[in-house]
Amino acid sequence: MQQISSPFSAAANPASWKGRLRDGRLIHIRPIDAADVSLERDFLSRLTPEGLSYRFLGLIKDNSEEAARDLTHFDPREFALAAIADEDGSEVEVGVACYRTSDDGTRCDCAVTVDPAWQKCGVGGILMQHLIGMARLRGIRRMYAVDAARSVGTHALARHLGFHSRPDPEDPASVTFELELND
């Protein structure tokens, strides 16, 4: 692997990857950037209210242009990957995985969400594998996520990826997932 002096340098941003889903479809994984506002807005419009709530723990409640813009313009501590599919010759965002590092750069909070029509095909797993790889490459030592305790799909994906879970002591409706990245 390439040594990178700054974990957020341009050299740390990959061009893209391809991923084959369980059903044989191909997706393109790439970093999200400011030019993706319309893809992100369309993606948000396909999420159910429950999906928005799971993904953003209730912080984003709509698919407005402002919400899409906020999700495509990052500060240097944030990184996000999109899963892009070709549907009838058009690019369609079908999933997103992102993280935000702590102030000291040793930990990051992560999240993943997948278009309901593309769930249970492997999109979330592929996105998270690449997100975990990028976090390791950038020297992050621990990744964590907080999600609704009722989110069964998230629990299964987290276990598959090697995360350990524990109930959130301050909120019984939430669970915290943690993954050590320095092994």
Language model segments and positions:
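Long, contiguous binding/interaction regions
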Residues: 1-183
